[in-house]
A protein has these predicted regions:
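Conserved ASCE/P-loop NTPase catalytic core
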Residues: 1-127, 131-149
Length: 150
């Protein structure tokens, strides 16, 4: 058995700030090693949790433009948040000649994602991306400068 992540039931809700929302960093991955026969291998001990799983039961915070700029991230993020199920997959694009990889079962997750971005990007996504409206129902605005209070 490989426990890729354990949350104590008495722990507070995790808050994860993902500064580099690559596919592997967000969704996790299955690492592979080059073996003596010249192929790529992996087993259940090679599963690595991503930010979404580490934030399970809590909050994941990231910059919206960073997430939108990474290949495959936006589509997978929408799918994951729409179904509340996370699939950890190997990054096949980096291992085009890899052997058979592990295919773990999808994991039920409960995570709230907070995207940080400017108003124009929000309005663009809200107008043209139907799933964005369903997933991100609340918009919060802060001033760039705020007075310090006691």
């Amino acid at each position: 058995m490989n426990v890729i992540l354990a949350h104590d039931s008495e722990d507070k809700s995790p808050v994860i700030f993902e500064t580099t929302p690559t596919y592997a960093n967000l969704f996790g991955t299955i690492q592979r090693a080059y073996d003596a026969r010249g192929g790529w291998t992996s087993d259940f001990m090679d599963l690595r949790a991503g930010s979404l799983l580490r934030a399970d039961g809590g909050f994941l915070i990231m910059y919206s433009l960073e997430a939108l700029s990474e290949v495959g991230v936006w589509r997978a993020l929408k799918r994951t948040l729409n179904h509340n199920r996370l699939e950890i997959q190997p990054l096949e694009m980096f291992y085009p000649f890899g052997g058979s990889a592990q295919k773990p079962e999808a994991i039920d997750i409960n995570v709230k994602v907070i995207l940080i971005g400017d108003r124009s990007l929000y309005e663009l996504l809200y107008e043209y991306e139907e799933d964005f409206r369903k997933i991100f129902k609340v918009r919060v605005e802060f001033d760039e400068e705020m007075a310090m209070s006691d």
